[in-house]
Amino acid sequence: MDSQPGIKAYNSVSLSLYNWWVLSVANRFAWRCSTSEVQLPFYRQHLSSRHLEIGAGTGYYPRHCMNISQLTLLDLNTECLFQALRRIGPARVKATVRHDIFLPFPEHLHQRYNSVALYYVLHCLNGSAEDKFTALKNATQALTADGIMFGATISGEPQRHNLFGRILMKVMNHKGIFTNYHDSAALLESQLGQLFREVTV
């Protein structure tokens, strides 16, 4: 299993276009899940003051939330960490961690956060359903006993998408940016049910 293909797409050039293309265009027209109307309010609703952001991206979501007192960014891609840190502001970020989510988390991150977010991470992970379950299980190591994990992902179920979404998903899988043809809401709910007492998908 190679966790690298998806992250290689995110460099300084692509990240400069990310907010426009992904958060404005694709979210609204391909995935029909508006950033401003759905995803950001959902993020704010589940956020805590001690928060771990897995998959730093451009830092868009934590940048638009001022109530995080202890924010840690975790990503395998150093450019994502750099860009997110720059956009959020170094004073607001307690730590950045370069780590592969397929591997167990460092002990200093265990049981430390009241919330963990995985926004647009799972569908980019290059691995099987079992591999993605391992990633989810690893991420739970960072949660306190009453902590919450939340996020957003793109299902591989074609019937859930319009024509634009189906075409875009095919292109992204072909390029190796997505690996989500076998991802489904039912599978995700089943996997999360093995890790948490309460699950909503």
Which residues make up each language-model segment?
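A short, conserved alpha-helix within the catalytic core of class I
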Residues: 125-138
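Class I S-adenosylmethionine-dependent transferase superfamily signal
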Residues: 138-140, 192
